Amino acid sequence: MKTHDQSNSRLIYDTSMFMQHNMDAVYKQGLVSFDIELSYIRAYLGMQKRIHPGLEVLVEDKVTEFKVPYNTIEPLVENAVEAAVETKQDGKVVVRSYERLDCFAIQIVDNGNGVSPVKKFRAKQDFRGLQKQLKSSVGALIEVRTKPDKGTILTVKIPKQGYVIKE
């Protein structure tokens, strides 16, 4: 059982990590290891669990040794959390990374109302801009599957071969 002090310490740590990530996003460009991006995602999810106690979060990071453009995956996770907690007390978000023969994949799943992220994505972050950045820097494709009242599955596929990664 966590003590109140441990819980507060974790919240302070998560908040500082997330703030650092946001400040770095102003001037950082290029690629980072997914492991680094995932550390900011974990910090964000930790903060959200504190704000939304009913939020269930699962991170399955089977593979993290590939690169992504800085600050492109975390905004997608933010959108999934917003969708999950918007209409449900018991929202759920799953973030997975795994490897296929031809690509690395990052999957973000929410149990929100199933509205397409393309239609709903926050005004401050342009979904199409993220798509373009992922495509131009690592050749990634984004697949979105959504079902009304069931949620959304967003998969980012980063090819292993046939694309030159621009750093």
Across the structure, where does each feature detected by a protein language model lie?
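A short coil/beta-turn micro-motif at the C-terminal edge
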Residues: E99, P148-K150, K160
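Short, charged, solvent-exposed linker or helix-capping segments at domain edges/interfaces
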Residues: I165-E167
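C-terminal beta-strand of the catalytic ATP-binding
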Residues: T155-G162
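Two-component histidine phosphotransfer core
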Residues: M1-R128, Q133-E143
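Glycine-rich nucleotide-binding loop
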Residues: G114, K147-T155
